[in-house]
């Protein structure tokens, strides 16, 4: 699998699937979630509402992943996953790893060859970017997936540098 890094807007990526750092409600939130819903259009929200009614009445559990249309985005699908909130008092890194692992499993079910990930949980959920990069890269590399390209799309320079430094250190 090829792993690449881009500093930019995940909603601009022409890949098979874009991963959304969603909240439990699946009904749109802030950050990446808001941008994906805004650019993708009402089709994404309509499918999320249907998923809430039919499969996830209590919301999507942390670490799980589910796909919808990508609406007007350049991608074919959006894979929604709910990252954990960072807490120094409790190790939630297995849940963060689950976000990447389960998103890749959904991508495999869809037949996606290319997937773009944001830095899940590093915004309002306050996960330290260097640790998030390590978990993301370790998990993606260890995943048994048919996905040919994983692209990490980092919104700012700090995120981009954290991910590329982790990659070049060989620790991730």
What are these regions (language model features)?
Residues 1-110:
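Glycine-/small-residue-enriched capping loops at alpha/beta junctions
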Residues 85-172:
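Phosphate/ribose-phosphate-bearing ligand recognition and processing surfaces
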